[in-house]
């Protein structure tokens, strides 16, 4: 079996290589380079990642190729993120990176020559009724199916997730026993292409700054100023620079550059129990096409270990609405609502939250 393995320089993808070699495979290793654009944003993390990936390749006597998808990334994923932010929405570039770059452009240029592509994502694949489904990982804290929820059937059918059945601690123990150079390396955080670059610096580069008012939702009183609505997301608590907190961002007026906040975590205006999903995407197929209008599901509206129980309502015209079993804080339009089966074992698909 001919396998392409994607390396990031981290412990997870390194253990993937170790496990594949243990099973008798000799995968071809690839590092996808996307990175920030511009000398003022130069960051050493990509160089460190490539050095670590090279060390793994050398340890197992495998070839490593650096695939430069910088142009494709910026024309697709970064442009998508900036467009959503400018509209006052909350994008998820990591979701689009997986769909369009790692399993899109890479597949078209390189992956098509291999039987499977193996990655260090915490996810699984499940064969059911003759079809491949995206399954959740053993480790609920590290599960990354919400970041994979926009891939299609052809993509999920070619993917291997060798560490999906392991807990994170088990992965680190394997790396330590195998003497992998990445065994003690910290997990990466934040958006995939930013490295150590500050998110606000990235946004400021493209959208600049424009002072606007921060207004208390209940009273209409101005309580502060901000540097641009695009620096803030629905549900945000930190970084507002207001005294007498806690304060939460409740909504944004994009036209007037106003941010509305509410005082105190338990304020009813912060919460909602339903939202709509635009352009819902089924990864494999719609498993409920013959069911009634309301289906019992679990779902996520942000990257957390917890699944929320609810109902998926299929409306006329192919639209979908989610009814949550509990109040939700910070429903952010632009983010992805990710839908799972009732047991939270299969990730069925996702769509953009429109509220």
Curated annotation (Swiss-Prot):
Biological process according to GO: tRNA modification
UniProt xrefs under InterPro entries: MnmA-like, MnmA-like_C, MnmA-like_central, MnmA-like_central_sf, Rossmann-like_a/b/a_fold, tRNA_2-thiouridylase_MnmA
A GO MF label: tRNA binding
Active-site residue list: 97 (nucleophile), 192 (cysteine persulfide intermediate)
Catalysed transformations (reactions): S-sulfanyl-L-cysteinyl-[protein] + uridine(34) in tRNA + AH2 + ATP = 2-thiouridine(34) in tRNA + L-cysteinyl-[protein] + A + AMP + diphosphate + H(+)
Pfam families in the record: tRNA_Me_trans, tRNA_Me_trans_C, tRNA_Me_trans_M
Covalent S-S links between cysteines: 97-192
This enzyme's EC code(s): 2.8.1.13
Compartment(s) where it occurs, according to its Swiss-Prot or TrEMBL record: Cytoplasm
Keyword ATP-binding: yes
Stretch list, region Interaction with target base in tRNA: 92-94
Keywords recorded for this protein, A-Z: ATP-binding, Cytoplasm, Disulfide bond, Nucleotide-binding, RNA-binding, Transferase, tRNA processing, tRNA-binding
Role this protein plays: Catalyzes the 2-thiolation of uridine at the wobble position (U34) of tRNA, leading to the formation of s(2)U34.
Protein name stated in the entry: tRNA-specific 2-thiouridylase MnmA 1
Organism: Bacteroides thetaiotaomicron (strain ATCC 29148 / DSM 2079 / JCM 5827 / CCUG 10774 / NCTC 10582 / VPI-5482 / E50)
GN (gene name): mnmA1
């Amino acid at each position: 079996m001919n396998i392409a393995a994607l390396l990031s320089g981290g412990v997870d993808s390194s253990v993937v290589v170790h496990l594949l070699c243990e099973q008798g495979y000799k995968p071809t290793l690839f590092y996808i380079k996307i990175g920030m654009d511009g000398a003022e944003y130069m960051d050493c993390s990509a160089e460190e990642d490539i050095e670590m990936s090279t060390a793994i390749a050398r340890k197992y006597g495998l070839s490593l190729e650096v695939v430069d998808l910088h142009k494709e990334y910026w024309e697709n994923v970064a442009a998508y993120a900036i467009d959503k932010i400018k509209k006052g929405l909350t994008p998820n570039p990591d979701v689009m990176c997986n769909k369009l770059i790692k399993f899109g452009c890479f597949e078209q240029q390189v992956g098509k020559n291999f039987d499977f592509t193996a990655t260090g994502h915490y996810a699984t694949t499940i064969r059911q009724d003759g079809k491949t489904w995206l399954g959740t990982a053993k480790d609920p804290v590290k599960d990354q199916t919400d970041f994979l929820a926009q891939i299609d059937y052809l993509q999920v059918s070619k993917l291997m997730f060798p560490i999906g059945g392991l807990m994170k601690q088990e992965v680190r123990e394997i790396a330590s026993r195998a003497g992998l150079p990445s065994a003690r390396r910290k997990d990466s955080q934040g958006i995939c292409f930013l490295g150590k670059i500050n998110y606000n610096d990235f946004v400021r580069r493209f959208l600049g700054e424009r002072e606007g008012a921060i207004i208390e939702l209940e009273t209409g009183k101005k309580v502060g100023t901000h540097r641009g609505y695009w620096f803030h997301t629905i549900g945000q608590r930190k970084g507002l620079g207001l005294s007498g907190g806690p304060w939460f961002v409740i909504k944004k007026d994009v036209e007037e550059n106003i941010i509305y906040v509410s005082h105190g975590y338990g304020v009813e205006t912060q919460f909602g129990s339903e939202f709509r999903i635009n352009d819902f995407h089924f990864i494999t197929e719609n498993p409920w096409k013959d069911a009634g209008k309301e289906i019992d599901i679990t779902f996520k509206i942000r990257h957390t270990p917890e699944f929320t129980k609810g109902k998926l309502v299929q409306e006329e015209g192919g639209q979908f609405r989610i009814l949550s079993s509990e109040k939700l804080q910070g429903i952010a339009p632009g983010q992805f609502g990710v839908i799972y089966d009732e047991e939270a074992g299969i990730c069925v698909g996702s769509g953009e939250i429109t509220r």
